[in-house]
């Protein structure tokens, strides 16, 4: 009966965090609008080989993540939940692997359930796992690869070892098809310390080639298909998206070596109090094979991405699966022997919630700021934000009431965030970061437009997805579409600022021309170097400018 209650509680937890509130949040640009539109175009065109964005070749990532996203929109429709369904599914599958792996290591159902709940409630996992990017997919394949390798190395027969390594190769191949060759580097780096300390080189060298073969066979069909369709794909993807992105001096998203320290700290909420003890206990028990494996799984990718010049928080998502298992194991030990860390965790959550309440007041219309984040007419959003932090502090306090028994309720600290964050976003943020909000405000003007031009790729993708059209023209800036715009068949999909007046004269009689520009909040739109318009509709950071036929 207790197991049934636990399962019901887990399903309710998943529903409240990962299912019910997802549709209430508008898509963010540039990431979510980009991936939503790529998948929409894949469904509309039926081309499941070459990814396109706004009808242009888009070679920043391989194809597998777009497949999953497209299936999500196919099943649930072109809506907010449909766009995010794929990443939610991947996150829940990763949580299932955490459950399975914890059970395999410790044979403890309660520990497995706690590890799963901790993983799903970690701030970084929840933030990325409900956000339509490709990182939850690659995290799933990396976690599946680590589970497969352990399965292979623990097998007692050659059939079991062979099956494990073949499965490892498939997961690595799918990882390559999701986000590239890092799906090969990260698992190798993660297992090497364990292989070295356990002296398991023989099995690795005897059976490792099976993983190589299955990885190649997994990638080969699509790899050959896209090479035939687009011969330049692999050169661009390998050199620009791997070497330049991570290693060269002009790498994207450059950050210092210590970049991931605050990411780990913030990402570990609401379980931050367990982080030091989990790592220390893991190190102290390093003679235990499973503990070494989890430590290596956590630390090696972190070091690898810290050394790389290009960094983003999403890169280390897979590390939190092993970290959740270490935290759950340590938490049960602490609850049994010395609950000091659990008390500290409760106070950290109280402090975080109270700090959030104070910060919300400071940036509210009733605070001391001259330009508050929320305006007076958005008072309900302020109360939503207060509720988010109040619930965080409340559950932090509740875990202290009988800490040996109530500490797991820290998983409910982000409940207010999950349910209310979509209702608390300030209008000034929505107007710049949520193209759907802009489209809703200007739908009647946008719909009949013959041509739509914009100076932001993220906004362009949002307009294309909302209006179900991929012919949005880039104005003045190419952004990440620079490569696709270089192809001869992309002629006419970009108009520079200097050419706009002539372009307008040539196309004005064909129908309404709409220009959507991103501007600074205090920028005077009358100073823009554009021909006089027939209509202007400013929505704070986005401006709709229209030219009608004459």
UniProtKB/Swiss-Prot annotation:
Signal peptide limits: none
Highest taxon of source: Bacteria
Listed EC numbers: 2.4.2.43
Location, primary (coarse class): membrane
GO cellular component: plasma membrane
Intracellular or extracellular location(s): Cell inner membrane
GO biological process, one term: lipopolysaccharide biosynthetic process
Keyword Cell membrane among record annotations: yes
Keyword Ubl conjugation part of the UniProt annotation: no
Pfam families per record: PMT
Pathway linked to the protein: Lipopolysaccharide metabolism; 4-amino-4-deoxy-beta-L-arabinose-lipid A biosynthesis
Enzymatic reactions: 4-amino-4-deoxy-alpha-L-arabinopyranosyl di-trans,octa-cis-undecaprenyl phosphate + lipid IVA = lipid IIA + di-trans,octa-cis-undecaprenyl phosphate
Membrane topology of this protein: Multi-pass membrane protein
Transmembrane feature ranges: 7-27, 81-101, 111-133, 137-154, 165-185, 204-224, 255-275, 288-308, 315-335, 346-366, 382-402, 406-426
Keywords in alphabetical order: Cell inner membrane, Cell membrane, Glycosyltransferase, Lipid A biosynthesis, Lipid biosynthesis, Lipid metabolism, Lipopolysaccharide biosynthesis, Membrane, Transferase, Transmembrane, Transmembrane helix
GO molecular function, one term: mannosyltransferase activity
Function in brief: Catalyzes the transfer of the L-Ara4N moiety of the glycolipid undecaprenyl phosphate-alpha-L-Ara4N to lipid A. The modified arabinose is attached to lipid A and is required for resistance to polymyxin and cationic antimicrobial peptides.
Similarity section: Belongs to the glycosyltransferase 83 family.
HAMAP family: ArnT_transfer (MF_01165)
Protein name: Undecaprenyl phosphate-alpha-4-amino-4-deoxy-L-arabinose arabinosyl transferase
Species in which this protein is naturally found: Escherichia coli O9:H4 (strain HS)
Gene name as annotated: arnT
